[in-house]
């Protein structure tokens, strides 16, 4: 049986994710109290091979030990995958302003920002046990649906998906990154007038980097690092591994490095995805 637990802060996209899972053939239950999880799974294990449930802040036990107890009472051989979806505070504030929905903690008469921050604190026990995370801050509904679909389908054939993501440090760290590498020490084509307005996807910029020994060494050592540890991640209960490489603005160095790593690991029959965060939003 495949069991996916979907959690995250209100407004982050849990409902969208659960709807996607339902379309993918999962038996879905929304807002199930975590204490009822073992009972539900035992009741339907003969009838359904794929189950997804969503858990929000109202369904969590008061003590984190109760969460562990609920997971330990699942049928033998059922290893839950926990998808935790979140967005930054500003994005969530904007979404609540647009929909005019009440936050689940609004009954405590907290201002919205304080309610969101309190919710984050309360969800920490399940967030810490997440096997995959999604930061939906910059994702449209379609993009969120697409990422959930890609990762679930990738998990169906038991293959770990490696996501190579480029980003700009000036715009903040990616929240869903498992490893972050800093490419700001590398030569920067931004200072070449003819390359400034191009990106790491352009041929002229790629030629510039191929002529830089430090860039070649950087890629070589990252590849060796991932070659060493990838087998260990493949044996764990994970759907994906996000490798984020950042430079100042996320246009040149990080884009080139991420592309190069993706191409190299694709040649090794590893399932990869590439995302260039700033090319979508600041390019």
UniProtKB/Swiss-Prot annotation:
Disulfide bonds: none annotated. It comes from the Bacteria. One of its GO terms (molecular function) is ATP binding. ATP binds at residues 8-15. Keywords: ATP-binding, GTP-binding, Nucleotide-binding. Pfam families: PapZ_C (PF22740), RapZ-like_N (PF03668). InterPro entries: P-loop_NTPase, RapZ-like, RapZ-like_N, RapZ_C. GTP binds at residues 56-59. PANTHER family: RNASE ADAPTER PROTEIN RAPZ. Belongs to the RapZ-like family. Displays ATPase and GTPase activities. This is Nucleotide-binding protein IL0393. It comes from Idiomarina loihiensis (strain ATCC BAA-735 / DSM 15497 / L2-TR).
């Amino acid at each position: 049986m495949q069991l996916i637990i979907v959690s995250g802060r209100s407004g982050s996209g849990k409902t969208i994710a659960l709807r996607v899972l339902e379309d993918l053939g999962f038996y879905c239950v929304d807002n199930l109290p975590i204490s009822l999880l073992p009972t539900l799974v035992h009741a339907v294990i003969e009838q359904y091979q794929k189950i997804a449930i969503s858990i929000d802040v109202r369904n969590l036990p008061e003590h984190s030990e109760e969460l562990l107890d609920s997971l330990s009472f699942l049928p033998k051989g059922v290893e839950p995958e926990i998808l935790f979806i979140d967005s930054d505070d500003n994005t969530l504030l904007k979404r609540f302003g647009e929909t005019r929905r009440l936050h689940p903690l609004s009954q405590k008469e907290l201002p919205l920002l304080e309610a969101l921050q309190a919710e984050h604190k309360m969800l920490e026990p399940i967030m810490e046990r997440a096997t995959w995370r999604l930061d939906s801050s910059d994702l449209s509904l379609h993009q969120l649906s697409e990422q959930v679909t890609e990762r679930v389908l990738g998990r169906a054939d038991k293959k770990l998906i490696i996501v190579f993501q480029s980003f700009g440090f000036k715009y903040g760290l990616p929240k869903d990154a498992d490893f972050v590498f800093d490419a700001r020490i590398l030569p920067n084509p931004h200072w070449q007038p003819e390359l400034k307005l191009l990106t790491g996807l352009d041929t002229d910029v790629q030629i510039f980097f191929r002529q830089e020994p430090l860039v070649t060494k950087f890629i070589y050592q990252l590849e060796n690092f991932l070659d060493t540890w990838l087998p260990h991640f493949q044996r764990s209960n994970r759907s994906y591994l996000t490798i984020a490489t950042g430079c100042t603005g996320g246009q040149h160095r990080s884009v080139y490095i991420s592309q190069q790593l993706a191409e190299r690991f694709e040649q090794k029959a590893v399932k990869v995805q590439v995302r260039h965060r700033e090319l979508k939003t600041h390019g």
